[in-house]
Design a protein with these regions (language model features):
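Histidine-acidic metal/acid-base catalytic patches
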Residues: 2-74, 146-148, 203-225, 229-309
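Active-site-proximal loop/turn and secondary-structure-junction residues that shape catalytic pockets
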Residues: 60-62, 85-87, 105-107, 156-158, ...
């Protein structure tokens, strides 16, 4: 698309500005209008007042006992500790916390292949029977606990065409959606990078994931948009959120490069990203999924403050 202001137009504007220099100096000396200075910008005036909710991913704090992590999370105003298995639910419930995204189940196929994790999952038809059984059990566990979200993965390509993988994922996931819909559980497939952390992972770009959501056609299947991972694969994070937020059920953070703190030591400007998420009217959870390089609880507290907009 051609820019609305060309280089030639810009040069003409600069030439005209020189002729108005004296007038500009006079205008600059005049005090600003108190009324105009107090008026909010259109973007801030349009922002929803309600803040989305905060969560933290358990695996990033493995050296911290879950009980201690839950206690600290509660004190920081974090409402969820996530990526937990059912045996961990009672611990966080003691502190009045939820699990905003429950960990995926894994199981062995009759051939002894462990499926359900990142590399081997829904893009293989031969895994579907095992996955359906494992996920139906986990869906019931999540619902019985009073939680609402369950993570899932595409699996790696392993030389499979992306379109074939898309079709296979849709076939398999549609088998468990009736139960998910009945129990009020949203399945969220995570977008992960295949460049640095998860080589060969299939659901590694937003358009692929969005197409899968459209094919499945259920409000109980959406995407987990991981800001760190998609910065590596696509960039253009804020525009992607603005254009596709209706397909996203959950968000993860992380500093890039390195997946450490989300502060000024990395390239993403999280306050602006959080404002973009808030502006969509999102009422779900944004989870901190960075690996602390400094004191873990101090870094977590700083991240939550940074993401409260």
């Amino acid at each position: 698309m051609k820019n609305s202001v060309s280089r030639r137009d810009a040069l003409k504007t600069l030439a005209g500005a020189a002729a108005l220099a004296s007038l500009s100096r006079v205008s600059a000396a005049e005090p600003a209008s108190p009324t105009s200075a107090a008026m909010p910008t259109p973007s801030s005036a349009a922002e929803p007042a309600e803040q989305f909710h905060h969560s933290v991913c358990r695996w990033c704090y493995q050296k911290t006992p879950l009980d201690e992590l839950a206690k600290n999370a509660k004190e920081m105003g974090i409402g969820s500790v996530e990526l937990l298995n059912p045996e961990d639910f009672p611990t966080i419930k003691k502190y009045g916390l939820t699990c905003a995204m429950v960990f995926n189940p894994t199981a062995k196929t009759p051939q002894g292949v462990t499926v359900g994790g990142i590399p081997k999952a829904w893009n293989r038809l031969e895994y579907h029977d095992t996955l359906v059984e494992a996920y139906e059990k986990r869906i019931n566990e999540v619902a019985d606990a009073g939680f609402e979200n369950l993570i899932c993965f595409s699996g790696n390509r392993d030389k499979m065409d992306d379109q074939q993988g898309l079709e296979n994922c849709a076939v398999g996931l549609k088998r468990i959606l009736p139960l998910a819909e009945k129990r009020g559980i949203t399945l969220s497939m995570e977008l992960l990078n295949s460049k640095v952390n998860h080589k060969d992972y299939m659901c590694d770009r937003t358009p692929w994931g969005v197409e899968l959501v459209k094919r499945i056609g259920s409000e109980r299947f959406k995407l987990l948009y991981d800001i760190y991972h998609m910065q590596i694969m696509e960039g253009d994070v804020i525009r992607t959120i603005q254009d596709n937020h209706k397909y996203f059920a959950h968000y993860h953070t992380g500093g890039n490069p390195g997946r450490h703190e989300i502060d000024e030591t990395q390239e993403l400007y999280y306050p602006a990203i959080m404002r973009a998420i808030k502006a969509t009217g999102f009422k779900g959870h944004v989870a901190q999924e960075f690996v602390p390089a400094r004191d873990p609880m101090t870094s977590l507290r700083q991240a939550v403050k940074l993401c409260t907009v």
